[in-house]
Amino acid sequence: SGMVVSPGFIDMHTHLEPIMEMPDAKSLIMQGVTLALGGPDGGGPWPFGSYLDSLEQLGTGPNLAYLIGHNTIRREVMGNVDQAPTLSQMDSMKNYVEMAMKEGAFGISTGLKYLPGTFAKVDEIISLSKVASSYQGIYTSHLREEGLGLIDAVQEAILISKEAEIPVVLTHHKAIGVKMWGASVKTLSLVDSARKEGL
């Protein structure tokens, strides 16, 4: 009496870095989370497949899924340099995304506010997201900007979704600073319009 029964919750943005030390993940289970999606904000494990193998051998409390992190693979290929990738570097990153998708990644994440993702132009993200899309993956993004550039950042994420034909999840969708008060009316309108287009 007075209780509610519901399906388990899916946590779409989980920093699972301590999972090897706390595999039971009691804090998630106690909140009703039965599936946690790791690798947000462009971060995540590398090498991807061997990390998942280690988790499987360890055993975890909740079900876990992971995204391949753009920052992780960009750093692996290019370091933290502020430049566009060469064709060879782009091919390497695409190969890493494809390999991770084949190894079980649920999609790709970006942290365009963080190094080295902040150096990536939209075309780079679209190209990599197309690879994830070809395996029915999703795209999640810590937006490039949450303050004065918020509207442009939301438009960028929607453009990536449209061009790569991939579902997008906006993480940390917030308007920072007094000058941005009320901007969420505009950004939520952009999201609603994108959803109506099937994105």
Task: List PLM regions with ranges.
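Histidine/acidic residue-rich metal-binding segments in metalloenzymes
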Residues: 85-110, 116-199
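Divalent-metal coordination cores built from histidine and acidic residues
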Residues: 3-4, 14, 22-110, 129
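Metallo-beta-lactamase
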Residues: 7-17
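Short acidic-hydrophobic sequence patches enriched in Asp/Glu that either
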Residues: 20, 24, 43-47, 124, ...
